[in-house]
């Protein structure tokens, strides 16, 4: 996903 591309984890 987009957030994964930014290295973010929710």
Swiss-Prot record:
GO annotations of cellular component type: extracellular region
Tree of life domain: Eukaryota
Give tissue specificity per the record: Expressed by the skin glands.
The answer to keyword Secreted applying to this record is yes
Q: What is the protein's major site of localization?
A: secreted
The record's subcellular location field reads:
Secreted
Listed A to Z, the keywords are: Secreted
Q: What is this protein called?
A: Dynastin-2
Where does this protein come from, organism-wise?
Limnodynastes dumerilii (Eastern banjo frog)
């Amino acid at each position: 996903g987009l957030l994964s591309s930014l290295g973010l984890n929710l």
